Amino acid sequence: MDMGLREMCVGEKRTVIIPPHLGYGEAGVDGEVPGSAVLVFDIELLELVAGLPEGYMFIWNGEVSPNLFEEIDKDGNGEVLLEEFSEYIHAQVASGKGKLAPGFDAELIVKNMFTNQDRNGDGKVTAEEFKLKDQEAKQDEL
């Protein structure tokens, strides 16, 4: 598929044919794709969305607040639950202050971000656990 989409322009329509050896092979997928199937895709490129740097699923567009944890912790109890975290990240994306990786499940990205911050796995993030990616890199250098 990658080869078939190379150098495609916005508004362009293209038929991509994938032979069995580049698709599902002789075996196919039981009950879904017959063996030795030739895959044919009619594609129209409607929009080209820039991705994120390698290794990132979320980026900030601009400066990050120095009081980020406090902003996420809406109820001020010193702990951020997944619901608070998710609402905050989605609000940042909606306002253009943040960007999630296009083409991926947004809820899954946010859940993974939260899980990465919840270092002790107790279902909540404290200020001590909370670190941005660049802060983690500095700590690793020590």
From Swiss-Prot:
Endpoints of the signal sequence: none
A single GO molecular function term of this UniProt record: calcium ion binding
Metal-binding is among the record's keywords: yes
Pfam families for the chain: EF-hand_5, FKBP_C
Protein name, entry field: Putative FK506-binding protein 9-like protein
Coiled coil region boundaries: none
Domain EF-hand: 60-95, 105-140
Repeat found in the keyword field: yes
Residues bound to Ca(2+): 118, 120, 122, 124, 129
GO cellular component terms given for this protein: endoplasmic reticulum
Lineage: Eukaryota, Metazoa, Chordata, Craniata, Vertebrata
Residue span, PPIase FKBP-type domain: 1-49
Keywords, sorted A to Z: Calcium, Metal-binding, Repeat
Organism: Homo sapiens (Human)
UniProt superkingdom: Eukaryota
TM stretches of this protein: none
